[in-house]
Every structure is written in structure tokens, then in C-alpha cells.
Amino acid sequence: MNQQQIDEMYMRRCLQLARNGMQNAKPNPMVGAVIVVPSPYRGETEGGSIIGEGYHVRCGEGHAEVNAFASVRPEDEHLLKDATIYVSLEPCAHYGKTPPCCDLIIRKGVKRCVVGCVDPFAKVQGRGIQIIREAGIEVTVGVLEKECQQLNKRFFTYHQHHRPYILLKWAQTANGFIDDHGQALALSTPYTKMLVHKLRSEYDAILVGRVTDEREHPQLNVREWYGKDPVRIVLGKNTQGESSTSSPLWGNREGLQSLMVEGGRQTLQSFIDAGLWDEIRIETSPKTVTGGTSAPQLPVGIQLQQEQFVDGNIIRTYRK
């Protein structure tokens, strides 16, 4: 393997570790870190050997780098001078609930630092990388960059666009209706329903329109997966009777990094028409009805990102 392939291999491990923080790291990003020493120290493994690894378990506790260094055995500490630390997100450079990770990396004296992507948080934004480089440590940035950014898509959207990452989600019949002449339809299978609850556990808030709330009284909580219930939001009407998608809810001050919209057609279409979406998830059942409410109209030129066949249903995902 060449160096790029080695770097990508260990960055994939960082991403794998980072995902373990999905539930408890919020509102912090998910981050994984791996410490690697050259092959001669640990047999003949091509590309080196891991002597430490960790991930950000819970907001307010040690970051991935802290946990990775803590996992290094005392008898391996002397190897750090020749080690490379891989981190899926730029090491922090500020004092928050924990000290700066860039200072820890410098203090441990590693030879090289490989970073997946730059942290968009205003107090970091390249400062961690700069500090580490100024200390004489070699830094490589941008290894599996898109994958690292995608892992924390909600965190990135919140800090770059000052609004939540917005997922629009609905289920429809094979002939494009979301209800049966105004009556609710059971279109998900037990398994795809579980997937929806898993999604809910990953989002900070979930929103429906007033009409859906009054007609269906949805619980909008997490029942068939584990994790916290999202904040429940019912989108009301302003004085002109229009959907209030310009509400201060979308402001940075609310602290919501992600929002799932499960409303009826009017609510979903208002988000689409306003361009307030990042991802659209549509579950299509093989069932058909003779009439009802038509599914929302997708934006012109939208690109399909993923298509899954699950229990006879088709789940399509679109992203901007």
C-alpha cells in the first residue's frame, strides 16, 4: 500500500469509531481517533499497527484524541515519538468543557497528525491545524474529507448555514398518494417503521403541521429504537394564514442542529418551495388507492442519492 491508501485505511477506522457516539456526543460532533506506529514496532503488519484508539463518547467528557491517548499501554508510551495520530475532525483549539486537544497532541510528541476535515466551529476553523504545525508536527488534511463531513452533516449545516439540517420524510402509495381520501394509511412495514424510529433518535427535533397534529395526534417520539425523543414541534399559522417557515426556530439561538419534517403535504411542500431542506426521504409502498392527497412535488432537477428495497417497499433518498 502507498501512503494515501494507508491514511485512508486508518481514517475509515476513525469513522467507524466515531459512529459509536451517535446518541450521546450531541451537540458535539462524532469524532474518532487512531494512533499508529510503523510496522517494525509491532510485527510485519503492512501500514503500521494501532497502539491506541478512541472516540468522543459523551458531550462534556473526553474528546476522541484524549480517549485514544488514554488507551495507549504504559509500555507503548515511548513509541509515540514515531507515531501518527489519525482524527476524523480537526483537533479543537479552544477551552470549552475540556482543554484543547491540539495541546495534548503536541505534549504527547507524535510525529504526524492526519485530519479528515476542518472543523467549521468558529472557535476552531483551522486553528487547531495551525497550532500543531507551528509545533513542528507534520499535518495532513483532507483524507476522506467528504465522508468525514457527511458523518457530521448536521453539525456542519448548523455551523456553516446557521440553521438545522433539515430532513423531509414521507410515505406514499405506488400511485403517489399519502392518504386514502383523507384517511391515514399504514404504508410502512414493521421493519421500515423501526428504521423511522431510528432516524427520529438521531434528530434534535421533529415537526408536523397543525392540520396533521389535529387530525392524527401523532406521538412523534422514539418507541421502536433506543435514544432520546426529539423535541416535538407543531408548525402553526401566522397572521396571514401562511406557513411560518420563517419562524425564529430556524435561528442559531435555538440550538437545534437537526430537524425532521413529517408533516402533511402542505407543510412538506412549503419547505420544498422555500428551499428549506437538505435531504428528502420517500418510502413507497406497493399499495395503491383510488384517490387521496397527492404526495409533495419534488424540486426540479433533484438527484437520487440512494435507493433501497426493504420488505417490499422502496426507500429513496435525495440530497442537495
Question: Which residues are covered by each model-predicted region?
Answer:
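Zn2+-dependent cytidine deaminase-like catalytic core
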Residues: I35-E147, V231, S270-I272
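Enzymes that bind and transform nitrogen-containing heteroaromatic metabolites
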Residues: N2-P29, G52, D76, K97, ...
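Helix-turn-helix
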Residues: G32
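Short, structured interface segments
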Residues: G142-H159
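Short Asp/Glu-rich motifs
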Residues: V124-Q125, L151-N152, Q219, T290
